[in-house]
Regions:
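A short, flexible beta-alpha/helix-coil linker loop
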Residues: 25-28
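C-terminal boundary of histidine-terminating zinc-finger modules
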Residues: 147-164
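Hydrophobic residues at beta-strand termini and immediately following loops
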Residues: 21, 135
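Phosphate-binding loop that captures ATP/GTP phosphates
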Residues: 1-20
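Conserved catalytic-core segment of NTP-binding enzymes
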Residues: 32, 36-134, 143
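Acidic-aromatic/histidine active-site loop/patch
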Residues: 105, 173-175
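A short, amphipathic alpha-helical segment
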Residues: 128, 165-173
Length: 175
């Protein structure tokens, strides 16, 4: 049985003050997890925290579907390369086929720079939706990833960090 106490025991507090419920260490540990478990965990977390952010895999299954159903907002992250945009279009089409409320989806483009020459209007035309936010390309992201730290912690003044913080304010409605 999944209890509040069990969920709290499984949380890890990052030194930034954010609580994280890490994924199982071994992929085989997911075999016994089902959508009802995710629903219960999300329910417990939403009673305890103001914001619950789920980093789901890029595949659709019953667990991801249930998490999406429970979400008040879905941030769909893409890059401007054609493979990513194609996958993003497939994800949008899949969600549309599930009658998922399209107003819940916020499209975020990651690692934008002038070299890509893909403008937000072109992305809107390709994907059929506005770009909610664009995070600029920043080499500090790769360095932060190698350190195992969020870029907003390792380099808070980096362009990407500032953009991510502003996006968080825009999403939360705070400020």
């Amino acid at each position: 049985d999944i209890t509040r106490e069990l969920v709290q025991e499984c949380l890890y507090e990052h030194n930034s003050g954010v609580f994280i419920l890490p994924a199982p260490i071994r992929p085989t540990d997911w075999r016994n997890v089902h959508a009802g478990h995710i629903e219960r965990i999300i329910g417990i977390l939403t009673q305890t925290y103001d914001y619950v952010i789920l980093d789901t895999p890029g595949t659709f299954n019953d667990i991801v579907a249930r998490a999406l159903e429970l979400a008040s907002m879905v941030v769909l992250l893409a890059t401007v390369d054609m493979a990513s945009l194609k996958d993003t279009l497939l994800a949008i089409d899949m969600l549309r086929s599930w009658n998922f409320p399209q107003e819940k989806i916020k499209l975020v483009i990651n690692a934008t720079n002038d070299a890509h020459n893909v403008q937000p209007q072109e992305i809107k035309r390709m994907l059929g939706r506005d770009v909610f936010w664009s995070i600029p390309y920043d080499r500090n992201i790769s360095a932060a990833t190698q350190l195992g730290m969020p870029v907003v912690v390792s380099k808070p003044t980096a362009k990407a960090s500032e953009s991510i913080v502003e996006m968080a304010y825009a999403i939360s409605g705070v400020r």
